[in-house]
């Protein structure tokens, strides 16, 4: 029979009832719909571990970065400080799974066995039994990743090199995510905590490896990660920071929180790949060039894109998808061909035009309906320069990418032209329309 580590802080650090917990996680993760869509996702995260009412929003900001990781990340290596039981080294549990109100997460026993020859890795179920630093991360991970296996290590006294050695052995590829759980300074007055934490945030971003436990309670695992980041020249990006005085606590004695992400591959690099896919698809048909294969797990997930062709800076074709219904690489290739050869506004692209053409690929977030009471309310909610809009009414639909704001910066004029594009009368009541918005990540290439 499988042995399970039961949830120890459900109902205290986070809701113990599954539906309430799922709703709270969804609220945190959906708190910032202004974030652009993501192609890349982090190799590692640094997240806080207080009760959700205190640090949940800061933790969620890190987990939002995993939007593109679902179905790719299959293993999470989770390290945090051992608060309850003294540990020499890094303590692995002997159980088969960790349980939360959202279900159980199986441990990667093979990965844990791969550490058996390292003297700094020990077995200790007591170190995990009541430990909250790892447990509070699991509901977020279960929500954003779905199925994954877990390598949990409660870290006690250990050197930087000892922690880094464990992380390097477990590093893996895109299937492996590293998560370090740590808070910042503890129990200073608000202003003093902000001063201390500001210095600590700068040191983390600079990949310092000599943080102490007055700066971060999880300094030991964090120093190990930062040593790996320094060795691999991976930048450390600050996502969010605050303290308990900013959330649910008083200001006399506060605890600091932060979240960071470490990316091995940037969105810019992923964008270069999408541009290359679009160009290769067009050149295969236009110039008879050999087909090019692009293999990467993230290209296999569903994605929605628009491909735009510009000739000497003027529109030459633009076709896209508003919903993610096919693999990302296929979506880009098909939309590139449609923009070049099937946009009804333009003749088919000719080979002689190709040298004057620039290719843009826009990667879309999932459209979200805007709930509004009247035109004034709608205008207040629209983010000029950022939102792409979809307008639907009377069986007609049209969209403008955010790029259109460059030529039509006025919100009323933008909506008026969108009505015209949909074939609707200029005096159509906006209250009778369904309007959704999305964000894009736009990439340019010759």
Model-inferred region functions:
Residues 191-194, 251, 366-370:
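Short glycine/threonine-rich loop-to-helix capping motif typified by GTGT followed
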Residues 175, 233, 252-259, 356-358, ...:
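Active-site lining segments that contact anionic ligands and/or coordinate catalytic metals
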Residues 266-446:
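Basic nucleic-acid-binding interfaces
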Residues 2-248, 261, 271, 289:
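Active-site histidine-anchored catalytic micro-motif
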Residues 246-266, 438-446:
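Short, basic/aromatic-enriched C-terminal tail that caps enzymatic domains
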Residues 17, 41-45, 75, 256, ...:
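A generic secondary-structure signal marking the coil-to-beta-strand transition
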């Amino acid at each position: 029979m499988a042995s399970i580590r039961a949830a120890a802080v459900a109902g205290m650090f986070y809701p113990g009832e599954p539906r309430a917990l799922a709703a709270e996680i969804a609220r945190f993760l959906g708190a910032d719909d202004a974030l652009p869509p993501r192609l890349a996702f982090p190799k590692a995260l640094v997240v806080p571990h207080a009760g959700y009412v205190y640090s949940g929003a800061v933790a969620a900001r890190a987990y939002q970065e995993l939007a593109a990781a679902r179905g790719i990340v299959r293993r999470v290596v989770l390290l945090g400080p051992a608060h309850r039981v003294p540990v020499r080294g890094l303590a692995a549990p002997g159980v088969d799974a960790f349980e939360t109100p959202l279900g159980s997460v199986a441990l990667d026993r093979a990965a844990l066995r791969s550490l058996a020859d390292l003297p700094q890795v020990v077995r200790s179920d007591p170190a995990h039994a009541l430990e909250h630093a790892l447990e509070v991360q699991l509901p977020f991970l279960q929500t954003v990743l779905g199925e994954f296996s877990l390598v949990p290590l409660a870290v006690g006294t250990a050197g930087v090199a000892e922690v880094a050695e464990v992380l390097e052995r477990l590093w893996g590829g895109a299937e492996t995510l590293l998560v370090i759980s740590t808070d910042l300074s503890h129990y200073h007055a608000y202003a003093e905590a902000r001063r201390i934490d500001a210095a600590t945030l700068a040191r983390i971003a600079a990949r310092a490896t000599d943080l102490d436990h007055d700066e971060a309670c999880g300094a030991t695992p964090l120093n190990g990660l930062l040593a790996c980041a320094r060795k691999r020249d991976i930048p450390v990006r600050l996502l969010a920071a605050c303290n308990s005085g900013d959330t649910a606590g008083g200001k006399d004695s506060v605890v600091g929180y932060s979240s960071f992400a470490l990316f091995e591959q940037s969105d810019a690099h992923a964008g270069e790949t999408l541009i290359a896919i679009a160009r290769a698809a067009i050149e295969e048909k236009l110039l008879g060039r050999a087909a090019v294969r692009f293999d990467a797990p993230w290209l296999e997930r569903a994605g929605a894109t628009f491909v735009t062709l510009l000739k000497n800076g003027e529109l030459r074709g633009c076709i896209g998808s508003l919903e993610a219904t096919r693999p990302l690489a296929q979506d880009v290739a098909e939309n590139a061909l449609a923009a070049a050869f099937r946009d009804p506004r333009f003749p088919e692209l000719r080979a002689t035009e190709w040298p004057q053409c620039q290719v843009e690929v826009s990667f879309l977030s999932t459209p979200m309906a805007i709930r509004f009471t009247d035109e004034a309310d709608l205008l207040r909610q629209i983010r000029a320069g950022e939102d792409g809009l979809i307008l639907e009414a009377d069986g007609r639909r049209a969209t403008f990418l955010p790029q259109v704001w460059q030529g039509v910066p006025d919100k009323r004029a933008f909506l008026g032209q969108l009505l015209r594009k949909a074939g609707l009368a200029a005096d159509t009541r906006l209250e009778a329309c369904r309007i959704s918005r999305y964000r894009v990540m736009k990439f340019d290439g010759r």
